[in-house]
Amino acid sequence: MDHNTDPPPTTMVDAAAALLLEPKLEGYDDDGGGEPLQPAPFVSPLDQLMQPPRPLEALLQGPQLPPFLSKTYDLVCEPELDGVISWGHAGNSFVVWDPSAFARDVLPHHFKHNNFSSFVRQLNTYGFRKVHADRWEFAHEDFLRHSKHLLKKIVRRRSSPTQQSGLQPGSSGESGLDPELNTLRREKSALLQEVTRLKQEHLQTIEQMSTLNQRLESAEDRQKQMVSFLAKLLQNPTFLRQLKMHRQQKEIDSTRVKRKFLKHVPHGNIDSGESSSQHTGESNLDFSPTSLDLPATHSDILDLQNFLLEDGDLNLAMLPENIGLDGIEAPDDIGALVQGFDTQEELELGSGVELLEIPPASGPRGQDPTIGRSKGKNVLSPGLDATSSEADCLGSFSDNMGMLSDSMLQTAGKLMDADDDERIWGVDASSALQSSCSGTSQQAYGSLVSDPYLMEMANKPEKFWELDFQALDDGDLQLDKCVIDDPALQQQRGNMNS
């Protein structure tokens, strides 16, 4: 007889009940030997209870999935929510297309909050990363389409004990960073203050540069005006001679006492003009009216050069490399004016010294009725009649004189005073100006040294360039009258001299 045993019970209670109710059976062999079969070994219920339990099917799947991952996976796979959240094109990421609708309609039904930022932070704790800068697209290497079983590999990140201790308030790590942060803050504040100071200095430097540029432009304008005026004087020597004659007839009382340097001249030379001429071997200057009718010659330009060269104060300022002017046109003789600068240092005179004047050149000495002896500035022959030609002659000159400052006029007067002093007191400048002056001019200048009338004029302080247009009335001031090219005036002077 075959003996079939039942399958093992599934539970301990069923196993214990089966053991108690199952009858004890004895079997015999099939061959009829009558020998009974060996009974089955007895297993007590306690032994069955001691057997290890068998796990259920759910336990075979490993650890359970976190609810957050399973819910998120279900939301991404749900077709109804494709307009709000769905898989990416490659299936290895998901995209939240409408964060506001996702937070308003989806999160409250599946999570305990409706904050989209909290949802993103929780994704970061599980290792998700944002893969697109312009949209909310997240990806994880184990979060794939049709691969839900890979979710068990996604583990929540846990902070290490060292990090937790470092994040605890009042920890030693935070206390060690505080001094460094304070030091950095102080350094930053100092750097900001330094930058502010440098900005202020930069602005001040810009203002100073602007002021210097304006001063340089003003100085260049004055130099251009001066050189233009001197060039025009070189081009009009006839007017220069008239200016010299007028200066010789004028007397201006000085309010201060000035020293006068007189060269000792023997009485014999003072009394006799002929002996002085023989001693110097030079002829006297001709200031007759006929000489005014002659055209401008090279010697006339040299006379002006002598006037301009005899003041040492302007020697350095008038050098070509110091002036730096390219637009001024002047005659070729102005080059000779520059050559004599270095040799004129011995002729420099103090600004507080008043020099003697050249006496009148035409008619009786100091008795010319046609030339007044008025005080003021720019008084040109106030006793003469005005003509249209005279007004034309002085038109351009008055315009140029208006452009010059008072200091420039005084400088021009010093130049002319220094020239007369050389010729009166016999200062030998012929060696310095030998390359630019002709022999006739040198002889003419030398003859003035022994002129007895010059010694007589020593006690008459004169200063040429103190001209005052506003000091005279309309009857005395005839600025627009010129005596250079008037034939009637020249004839009148010839009659007076004859």
Swiss-Prot record:
Q: List the disulfide bonds.
A: none
> Where does this protein have compositionally biased stretches of type Polar residues?
160-174, 272-291
Gene Ontology MF, one: sequence-specific DNA binding
What keywords sit in the KW lines?
A: Coiled coil, Cytoplasm, DNA-binding, Nucleus, Phosphoprotein, Stress response, Transcription, Transcription regulation
State if Secreted is listed as a keyword: no
Describe how it is modified after translation.
Answer: Exhibits temperature-dependent phosphorylation.
- Name any Gene Ontology BP term: regulation of transcription by RNA polymerase II
Segments carrying the region annotation (Hydrophobic repeat HR-A/B) are 184-234
Q: Which residues form a coiled coil?
A: 180-235
Q: What is its main location?
A: cytoplasm
Q: Where is this motif: Nuclear export signal?
A: 309-316
User: What sections of the protein cross the membrane?
Assistant: none
In this record, what's one Pfam family?
HSF_DNA-bind
The protein's location, in the record's own words, is:
Cytoplasm; Nucleus
Question: Which residue intervals make up region (Disordered)?
Answer: 156-180, 263-291, 356-382
PROSITE patterns recorded for this chain?
HSF_DOMAIN
Where does the record locate the signal sequence feature? Answer: none
The UniProt entry, under Gene3D superfamilies, shows: Winged helix-like DNA-binding domain superfamily/Winged helix DNA-binding domain
What positions does the record give for the motif labelled Nuclear localization signal? 258-263
What does this protein's UniProt record list under function? Transcriptional regulator that specifically binds DNA of heat shock promoter elements (HSE).
Q: How does it assemble?
A: Homotrimer.
Instruction: Quote the entry's note on domains.
Output: The hydrophobic-rich region (HR-A/B) corresponds to the oligomerization domain.
Recorded family membership: Belongs to the HSF family. Class A subfamily.
- List the protein's name: Heat stress transcription factor A-3
Q: Which organism is it from?
A: Oryza sativa subsp. japonica
